[in-house]
Amino acid sequence: MSMSSIPSSSQSGKLYGWVERIGNKVPHPFLLFIYLIIVLMVTTAILSAFGVSAKNPTDGTPVVVKNLLSVEGLHWFLPNVIKNFSGFAPLGAILALVLGAGLAERVGLLPALMVKMASHVNARYASYMVLFIAFFSHISSDAALVIMPPMGALIFLAVGRHPVAGLLAAIAGVGCGFTANLLIVTTDVLLSGISTEAAAAFNPQMHVSVIDNWYFMASSVVVLTIVGGLITDKIIEPRLGQWQGNSDEKLQTLTESQRFGLRIAGVVSLLFIAAIALMVIPQNGILRDPINHTVMPSPFIKGIVPLIILFFFVVSLAYGIATRTIRRQADLPHLMIEPMKEMAGFIVMVFPLAQFVAMFNWSNMGKFIAVGLTDILESSGLSGIPAFVGLALLSSFLCMFIASGSAIWSILAPIFVPMFMLLGFHPAFAQILFRIADSSVLPLAPVSPFVPLFLGFLQRYKPDAKLGTYYSLVLPYPLIFLVVWLLMLLAWYLVGLPIGPGIYPRLS
């Protein structure tokens, strides 16, 4: 059935329909960012002409907007157009991951693996399985945002459910719940370092450890898995109707060749993991930090994405040879070319997106907006629960316009960490508030390079889907996740539970 007009007689259905209609009137993402660049250029020219600035509450220095339409702006822009595009960090990582994951899909490894997994899962609980796997996949950082959504769709296909529902459930897990982790991951390392630096302004002895949010974030995985599963089953899938894809899109029973291939792939996977473990677990492992011999940070953590790509290549090659989907050397590049063709639209969209992000950063607009809004919130005199909500809403708003969560926290932490400490709260508690807000709205952020990617995934199953279709379908997850997560944190605070080992919301 068509998803461009999703049936519902309820008020919520009318809301989603309105969001879809409005969203579908938004120009193609390529044109959208062209228009945003024009608006940004005019805005910087006006603010610069009138000498508008914002006062940085941290050191009192003015934050001035730089004019993109000035001679200085032109001199910066022309030599950096190609650099802005080729140096756009997510582009290389996404394309490289698609090479690996695309090969795994083309040789038949991922579909076979999904059928194998689905054979042990009741279709009724598929939503919860997809979400839980998505949360666990955060150990691979941004790679999870590329790998998990297509896998979620395949899992739902395997159990006879709508693939778009599986796709959206996976996006919710890797996107809305990006910072909810069972394990300590790179996000913990990055944010805790920023928080420690910010706390030093108030108390030089204060240290925010990588495990200071662990109890709360690990518990969040359980809560959000349940919440996300209910959203998928009760809200999303009923709106999609019955999946009416072609018969060849449905995953079939595994053949003997596929079973043999999975066994070979499993053995190779274990050997690969064992080899990496031997380079990481020993104190003198070659993938540990060469000076401090730590795992976090280390070449292993910094190189996690290349290692995942290599893992895909090695295991896919083993499966392909075992099942004879790879018969000769020439098959390998051919199989990798096909998934890259599907990324052409994404690459085109990234060009203006990369220019917009670079221009936004160079002009100081991001810092100007952040500092201005932060100053308003700080001067409002909020404390306690209103301060919690204020920081969360401010963070959510900024995350819609600044793609890097660490960049936003670098701006907010120097103001809010000392402010929360003055109110008697641990800096790790302020950090949790930011993490909740940052994660929840990730699938909605128009400047995120992953939104066009998610739209491309959706168009595999709904070719005529537009940005409005995507937003109307994914919208319940960010809204409900944000509310439930904040309520969970409020309950955690009121009960007085530790948010990490020996760390409580309030300073002792």
Curated annotation (Swiss-Prot):
GO BP term (any one): p-aminobenzoyl-glutamate transport
GO-annotated cellular components: plasma membrane
Keywords of this entry: Amino-acid transport, Cell inner membrane, Cell membrane, Membrane, Symport, Transmembrane, Transmembrane helix, Transport
Additional remarks: It is suggested that in wild-type strain abgT would normally be cryptic or not expressed under conditions of growth on minimal medium. Altering the expression of abgT from its wild-type context appears to be the mechanism for obtaining the growth phenotype.
Gene name of this polypeptide: abgT
Lineage, broadest ranks: Bacteria, Pseudomonadati, Pseudomonadota, Gammaproteobacteria, Enterobacterales
InterPro entries found in the cross-reference section: AbgT, AbgT_Proteobac
Catalytic activity: N-(4-aminobenzoyl)-L-glutamate(in) + H(+)(in) = N-(4-aminobenzoyl)-L-glutamate(out) + H(+)(out)
Top-level taxonomic group: Bacteria
GO function term, MF aspect, one: secondary active transmembrane transporter activity
Protein name (record): p-aminobenzoyl-glutamate transport protein
Record's subcellular location: Cell inner membrane
Protein activity control: Completely inhibited by 100 nM sodium azide and by the proton ionophore carbonyl cyanide m-chlorophenylhydrazone (CCCP). Is also strongly inhibited by 100 mM potassium fluoride.
Listed PANTHER family: P-AMINOBENZOYL GLUTAMATE TRANSPORTER (PTHR30282), P-AMINOBENZOYL-GLUTAMATE TRANSPORT PROTEIN (PTHR30282:SF0)
Inducing or repressing factors: Could be transcriptionally regulated by AbgR.
Cited Pfam families: ABG_transport
Function (record text): Essential for aminobenzoyl-glutamate utilization. It catalyzes the concentration-dependent uptake of p-aminobenzoyl-glutamate (PABA-GLU) into the cell and allows accumulation of PABA-GLU to a concentration enabling AbgAB to catalyze cleavage into p-aminobenzoate and glutamate. It also seems to increase the sensitivity to low levels of aminobenzoyl-glutamate. May actually serve physiologically as a transporter for some other molecule, perhaps a dipeptide, and that it transports p-aminobenzoyl-glutamate as a secondary activity. The physiological role of abgABT should be clarified.
Effects seen without this gene: Cells lacking this gene loss the p-aminobenzoyl-glutamate utilization phenotype.
Membrane topology: Multi-pass membrane protein
Transmembrane segment boundaries: 30-50, 85-105, 121-139, 140-159, 164-184, 211-231, 261-281, 303-323, 343-363, 382-402, 405-425, 439-459, 479-499
